[in-house]
Swiss-Prot record:
Domain of life: Eukaryota
Record remark on domains: The twin Cx9C motifs are involved in the recognition by the mitochondrial disulfide relay system.
Family: Belongs to the CMC4 family.
Gene3D superfamilies recorded: CytochromE C oxidase copper chaperone (1.10.287.1130)
Name of the protein in question: Cx9C motif-containing protein 4, mitochondrial
Chain positions of motif Cx9C motif 1: 9-19
Name of the gene this protein is made from: CMC4
PANTHER family documented for this protein: CX9C MOTIF-CONTAINING PROTEIN 4
């Protein structure tokens, strides 16, 4: 077993971070990039099995849940305005 860190899907994960920074961490504006990461991670698990691991991908069971939620059109997150004024 290798001690090497698996960074499969790193470009997609970095794209999410860049999008979040550009959009004030409003996750709903970065759905495209989140979907791209999930697609990449799905391919990763299909090729390597459900016990595989990448620091850029959610665990297999969580990815399955997220993919199912997105198929149903559920939104991952909304920015809640907590400013009072």
């Amino acid at each position: 077993m290798s001690d090497e860190i698996n960074e499969t899907c790193k470009p997609q994960a970095c794209a999410i971070q860049n999008c979040l920074m550009k959009n004030g961490y409003n996750e709903s504006k970065c759905s495209y990039y989140i979907d791209e990461l999930y697609k990449c991670c799905k391919k990763f698990y299909e090729s390597n099995g459900s016990s595989a691991s990448s620091v850029c991908c959610p665990k297999f069971n969580l990815l399955q849940l997220k993919l199912k939620q997105r198929e149903l059109g559920q939104i991952d997150a909304n920015l809640i305005d907590t400013k009072h004024g």
